[in-house]
Amino acid sequence: MNVPIKLIGNGKAPVYKSAGASCLDCYARLDDTEVILPKERARIPLGFAMELPEGYEAVIRPRSGMTSAGVDTAIGTIDSDYRGEVCACLINNSTIRAIVKNGDRVCQMKIQRAEVITIVVTDELTDTERGSNGFGSTGR
C-alpha cells in the first residue's frame, strides 16, 4: 500500500528501521532543542502530513528507547481525513529534564485498518464467565 507523505520544513519521512518492524520510526522536526522538564509534556511536530486511505488510521506509539529513559509518548490516532502535520505528545515521567533535538527518533507510527462499527443500544448483554470483573481480575 502506498501512502502519500508531504514533508514539512526540515521534516524527515517515517521509516521502518528493520526488515521485521511493524511500526515506522518518526523524527522530531524542531527549530530549537526542546527541553521537557520532569512531569511535564510537550507537543513535538514530526515534520510530515499524510494521506491515509479511507478505512485506515495511523496510531502514534512510544519507542522503547524513549520509554526506558522515562519519556513516554501519549497514544494518538491520526484519522484518514486529517491532512495537517502529525505531532506526538511526549511526557517526561523521569526526575531529570529530557532533551529532544531536531531529527531525534521520538515515536513510532503503526498504520492499520480502522473498522467502522454500528452502535446498537440494548438493555441486556450476553453473560460470560468473566462478567463485569475488571482491573486485574484475570490475574497477573
Regions found by a protein language model. Name each.
Residues 1-140:
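DUTPase catalytic domain/fold
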